[in-house]
Amino acid sequence: MDQKEVIGETGHKSVDLIKIMDKWQKKWTEAKIFEAEHDSRDKFFITAAFPYLNGVLHAGHLRTFTIPETIARYQRMKNKNVLWTFGFHVTGTPILGLANQIKERKEDIIWAYNNLHNIPMDELLKLNTPEAIVECFSKKATEAFKRMGFSLDWRRNFKTDDKVFSKFIEWQFYKLKEMGHITKGSHPVRYCPKCENPVEDHDLLHGEESTTVEYSLIKFTSKFDGKEIIMPMATLRPETVFGVTNAWVNPNEIYVMAEVHDEIQKLDSEDVDLKYNGIWIIGKECADKLKEQDRKIEILKEIKGSELLGLKIKNPVTKKEVPLLPADFVEMGIGTGCVMSVPAHAPYDYVALRDLGKVEEVGLIPLIEIEGYDKYPAKEIVEKLGIKDQNDEELLEQATSKIYKDEFHKGKLNENCGEYTGISVKDIKEKLTKDYINSNIAEIMYEFSEQKVVCRCGEKCIIKTVKGQWFINYSDENWKKLAHECIDNMNFAPEGIRQEFHNKVDWMKDKACARKRGLGTILPFDENWIIESLSDSTIYMAYYTIARFINEGLTPEQLIPELFDYVYLGNGNAEEIAKNSKIQAETIEEMRKEFLYYYPLDWRCSAKDLIPNHLTFMIFNHVALFGREHWPRGIEINGYVTIEGKKLSKSKGPVLPVSEVAENFGADVARFYITTCAELPQDADVKFKEMEKARDNLIKLYDLAVSVMEEESAEKELSLIDKWLLHKTYSSINSAETAYEEFQLRKIGLMFYELINDLRWYKRRGGENNSVLKEVVEIWTKLLSPVTPHLCEEIWEKLGYAGFISQEMYPVSKPELINEDLELGEEFIKSAMEDIRNIKGVAKINPEKMYLYTADDWKYDLLEFMNENAEKNVKALIPMVMKEDKFKRHGKEVMKLINEIMKIGVKKAIAEVEILENAKTFIESEFDCKVIVNGEDVKGKKKFAIPYKPAIYME
């Protein structure tokens, strides 16, 4: 096979990637080379958030899991003792719900799992119990991991419904309760009425990222139908009550008059007392919601919205009466169906009043002073943007967003706000809400941040105040301080997400940690409850460290709390625990050593959807249960995955099962593409044409390896182009190391594609040193092996090496072969040739003779001067340059040259004449003409030459 053909435009399709994949996976399994135990080497412990087994592993899993897999392989090459393993998440209600849906033969579910998850119909219809689903998808997940060539220690694998794992979770919850972190009480939670359970993100079909939003209900009052009534107005900005000029109701909707009682929970009991809270007029949907939020609602009558128009209601803060006016934009699914109007500051309100011709009648009341705005910000921005009416929704959204942002960051309450005058908008909400509640002019109502929040069972979720519920008190300020301390000392990839974790900790509230149904561990101190799935998955990384011992045959009964106290906290005596647990003391000591060796966790890897829940909970639980020396050290976050621009969906598609990708493209192609197609925080869009290109380029490396082994590798004196290729290759060792260390895996892909281009250039420049090519292939096979291990194992074997490349050390760079001048020289030649092509194209000539002129010496001196002062901008640089006599005499030409050099980039000066002379034969062959370097100055062209840009004349 001719190497020149191999590194040309197309690679051979002579290699069977699937066959290679099968071969090396079998060899790895037989050799057990990825099983890890404590020894004298430095350790490296990396994990990813384990998958939930209600479907096959898909492209999103592939990206999230291949990143730590790649880093694990790299760290082994750095002689680290790497622990990299996986468990499976099965607890909670989704699997239970799926089993019921299959049992009921739900058409959409049957279609999805048959067509998207590729489950044969006869097998699918048997998945009508949680146990069958767990067995099916745990096997498929295991097979998918193995088909992708993941270098896992399978001895540590577990499922979260394992009885032995439940003993670990029981220990965790006993500890949290002892510390006062678990309490019982009433709290608003996301709730499924059909399942009769609080629901978490994993339980949802829609609205996984929804949060619970706290609205203030401002209690306006009036008389209606002969009764004193309250008309509560829901708002996220209670300070705006000072600027209310009217209120909006929807004339086309149904409202209710209802008698409201507050439910007051009795001490140490789930029973309640009722406290009368007046007669309210609210939307019908609002009444249904408030029934679930510590209120008893008795409907007295229904009222059409149109019947309320013109009613005067009293502002409880300003004591002014304002009218109810009609507005079709009032959404009954949010708040109470009655909305405060603040037209001085809300563009929607101002435009709606203007459309009704009511602006002058009700007036405008300013309440916030904002730098850069006049007295009435909404009026000003509406007129500035030319908003015609309420149909200009896009402009209204733009106006509203800008004003609210500016008010929050720069606004202060004005003299219309009484005792609150001068307080900034960003600081007022909490104080004002507290004052209003204490004065009985406001209450709290909870809504979702998204309107569509649906349980996996298909039921629409609500916010319910659950009584007698167990909570983890993540709102504890002292606990939050420890979490912040942990975050401050962690590594993050990308670094920019650190602040997001701080924000999540600040916003964290108490969280329901148990439910009445589903799979999982029974709450050890209240057997009526089951620990929910985001609470039993916060410290299981510690379980990995001892799972191999447990999986050798320990029983749940042997895993007594004292065992975990000793292993994880160092409390107690191994001999005493051995007597009580019937576990050998030596095994207990080994478990303790293994934990101390591998902990803390070096890196936790996940997609960004787990930041507000699992990952933040992980930090909280670690700082509560473990000493600082065992707090997690790093978190890596990647973006989502789409398929040809379409969002992944387990129920609607696309899914792209991992096993399908492995069989169609080969594991290495999938691994290479998914880790290198996007920067870490960006979403990755899988495009099959690009995967095919990746496959072709990987095959080129294989074919090159075969070709260099077929040809003689006689020692030759190194040419300049040989030295250039070696420089590029040995420079790549350092660059790749940095990329791996910083999780910048896209750079590995870009470097590989650059290698392919470099090999083409090497061939084009006459490179033919087989020894050099073999050296390049050996190094790059190592550099790529963490990403494409099967192909690299095969190449390593073809190169004549015994053993696994998976156990080789990372290549060592050779500083003596790194010479930046070589790289700058070749880039200079490429640039000059591009300029020649452009001139030929514009002039439309085929020259017989071509003159290349390099710059005058003073121009190189200027380049060096700029290089020495590279931190200076042009404005600062010019006075410094003009102080030098050798530059000053060239006057305006200097100014122009500085700008031109800045455009091409300030680089060190190189021997351009020598470089062009050495490349002259090559350039002549490329353009089929005679090349003269710095010959006679034909038509005065030489003066146009600048460093890195030779002047060109053709004839």
Curated annotation (Swiss-Prot):
One of its GO terms (cellular component) is cytoplasm. Keywords: Aminoacyl-tRNA synthetase, ATP-binding, Cytoplasm, Ligase, Nucleotide-binding, Protein biosynthesis. It is found in: Cytoplasm. ATP binds at K650. This is Leucine--tRNA ligase. Belongs to the class-I aminoacyl-tRNA synthetase family. GO terms for molecular function: aminoacyl-tRNA deacylase activity; ATP binding; leucine-tRNA ligase activity. A motif ('KMSKS' region) lies at residues 647-651. A motif ('HIGH' region) lies at residues 51-61. The keyword Ligase applies. GO terms for biological process: leucyl-tRNA aminoacylation. Pfam families: Anticodon_1, tRNA-synt_1, tRNA-synt_1g. Its main location: cytoplasm. Its EC number is 6.1.1.4. It catalyses: tRNA(Leu) + L-leucine + ATP = L-leucyl-tRNA(Leu) + AMP + diphosphate. It comes from Methanococcus maripaludis (strain DSM 14266 / JCM 13030 / NBRC 101832 / S2 / LL).
